[in-house]
């Protein structure tokens, strides 16, 4: 074998060994899709499809199991090691970035859907009318957001969140007892809808984050007094990340089963793709522009660094998000990519990423804006400039309120449609392709969070380094003072000449 060939082979083997997990994860996505399409011809029963998806279900369980301890330990340990000024700077930088990129994503989506015009009334005739949709109120949703930010019971927030539900109520008393009124009462004509604030299952991520931020900042203000408590959360954070690394080696098999099972679940794949092809092209084009042009441009302008080199280090997180369709479930892998591959300070990642996984939903905001205007187009409704602005603002706010769980975009979509008076039931028409779009927009959400962490780190690196130098100086001074005190104590314990003479 020639020397050059042998060297190239060694380099390739070395690269594969170093990036084995990444290679396995990418292969699992490709093989999962391929096997899914090949097995569609067998027309497997729902029970058999469930068995195929089961290893993927276990992966989701394992990743979600890590979310609560990871958010608590990462946020508290990260903020506790910063002073209040640094925490405020990190927070303001992160929120500014989140709001700006979300607005850019929405504008991109609206521009494309108006130019491409994927919606046509004939599509609705082919697909049929939608099923009855849920009632939803923008005001009630915003109130729920605030209620969830400040939970009345922190323990309850770990497994339940507040949600306004709407129930039909039949009047118990009527003014007129004539036959017409009684008939209307019996057939439900006098029924009215009443809003009821209830608890639904699912972790209140926003409430947990707000509570952990408060605890972290309070611990940082206590200083040395809270040292033991801070170390507890730092060590807990390291333990969770060690567990995550173990789970990551199972993730390729889990993602393979998730993708294959999801493709097998879809009915009439070819017909759905044909009828909603232009809608999918519009959404995917918007997501591609946002992830390959807008975000890299923002990153380059703010940091003067090559964004594509930075994105290469995030590939593992991007692929995992594609497989799991959950920003929160991908959070541990995103931590690992930023800290190990790209050298971002853990104090930045531990604060910026958990918040970003909850409120920064660029892909979701873009998708909601496109879907809302697409539904208007298939209903033959022409939206005025004011209504388009309303769509953009509502899509931005709705994406912030979206929980970082699979298909949350469909739920918040109801807000956008209600805001401009479009039929809510037509959301069901685009559900058929949401399984694919959900995965891709989630991967864009994760990419946006990670690039935000990189930008925040760029602007806060000098402050963090200065804080570290000050802490090191203070620690050295403290050690010197303790040594001096020990020497003085030893000197004072020695007997004097008079004491020696007396003895």
From Swiss-Prot:
Membrane topology: Multi-pass membrane protein
Pfam family, one: SDF
Alphabetical list of InterPro entries matching this protein: DAACS (IPR050746), Na-dicarboxylate_symporter (IPR001991), Na-dicarboxylate_symporter_CS (IPR018107), Na:dicarbo_symporter_sf (IPR036458)
Keyword Lipid biosynthesis included in the entry's annotation: no
Organism listed in the record: Caenorhabditis elegans
Family, as annotated: Belongs to the dicarboxylate/amino acid:cation symporter (DAACS) (TC 2.A.23) family.
This protein's GO CC annotations: cell projection; plasma membrane
UniProt entry tagged with the keyword Glycoprotein: yes
Function field: Transports L-glutamate and also L- and D-aspartate. Essential for terminating the postsynaptic action of glutamate by rapidly removing released glutamate from the synaptic cleft. Acts as a symport by cotransporting sodium.
Gene (UniProt): glt-1
UniProt name for this protein: Excitatory amino acid transporter
Keywords: Glycoprotein, Membrane, Symport, Transmembrane, Transmembrane helix, Transport
PROSITE patterns, per database record: NA_DICARBOXYL_SYMP_1 (PS00713), NA_DICARBOXYL_SYMP_2 (PS00714)
């Amino acid at each position: 074998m020639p020397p050059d060939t042998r060297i190239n082979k060694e380099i390739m083997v070395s690269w594969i060994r170093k990036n084995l997990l990444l290679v396995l994860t990418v292969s699992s996505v490709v093989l999962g899709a391929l096997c899914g399409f090949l097995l569609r011809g067998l027309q497997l029963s729902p029970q058999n499809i469930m068995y195929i998806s089961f290893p993927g279900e276990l992966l989701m369980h394992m990743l979600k199991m890590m979310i609560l301890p990871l958010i608590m330990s990462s946020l508290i340990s990260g903020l506790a090691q910063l002073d209040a000024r640094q925490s405020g700077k990190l927070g303001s930088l992160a929120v500014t970035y989140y709001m700006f990129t979300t607005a850019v994503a929405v504008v991109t989506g609206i521009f494309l859907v108006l130019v491409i015009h994927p919606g046509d009334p004939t599509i609705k005739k082919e697909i049929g009318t939608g099923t009855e949709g849920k009632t939803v109120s923008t005001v009630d949703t915003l109130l729920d957001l605030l209620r969830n930010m400040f939970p009345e019971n922190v323990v309850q927030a770990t497994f339940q969140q507040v949600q306004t539900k709407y129930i039909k109520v039949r009047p118990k008393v009527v003014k007129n007892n004539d036959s017409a009124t009684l008939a209307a009462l019996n057939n439900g004509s006098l029924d009215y809808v009443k809003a009821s604030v209830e608890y639904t299952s699912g972790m209140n991520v926003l409430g947990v984050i707000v509570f952990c931020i408060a605890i972290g900042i309070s611990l940082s203000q206590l200083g040395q007094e809270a040292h033991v408590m801070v170390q507890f959360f730092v060590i807990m954070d390291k333990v969770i990340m060690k567990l995550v690394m173990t789970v990551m080696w199972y993730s390729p098999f889990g993602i393979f089963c998730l993708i294959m099972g999801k493709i097998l679940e879809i009915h009439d794949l070819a017909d759905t793709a044909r009828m909603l092809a232009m809608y999918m092209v519009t959404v995917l084009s918007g997501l591609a522009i946002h992830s390959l042009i807008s975000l890299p441009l923002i990153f380059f302008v703010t940091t003067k660094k090559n964004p594509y080199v930075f994105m290469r280090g995030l590939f593992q997180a991007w692929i995992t998000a594609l497989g799991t369709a959950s920003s929160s479930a991908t959070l541990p892998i995103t931590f690992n990519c930023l800290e190990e591959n790209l050298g971002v300070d853990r104090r930045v990642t531990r604060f910026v990423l958990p918040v970003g996984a909850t409120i920064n939903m660029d892909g979701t905001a873009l998708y909601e804006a496109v879907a809302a205007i697409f539904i208007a187009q298939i209903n033959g409704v022409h939206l005025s400039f004011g209504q388009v602005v309303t769509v953009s603002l509502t899509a931005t706010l709705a994406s912030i309120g979206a929980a970082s769980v699979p298909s949350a975009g469909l739920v918040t979509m109801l807000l956008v449609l209600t805001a401009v008076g479009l039929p809510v039931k037509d959301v069901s028409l685009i559900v058929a392709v949401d399984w694919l779009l959900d995965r891709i927009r989630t991967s864009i959400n994760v990419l946006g969070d990670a690039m935000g962490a990189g930008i925040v780190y760029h602007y806060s690196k000098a402050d963090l380094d200065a804080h570290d130098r000050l802490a090191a100086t203070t620690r050295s001074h403290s050690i010197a003072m303790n040594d001096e005190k020990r020497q003085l104590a030893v000197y004072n314990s020695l007997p004097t000449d008079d004491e020696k003479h007396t003895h």
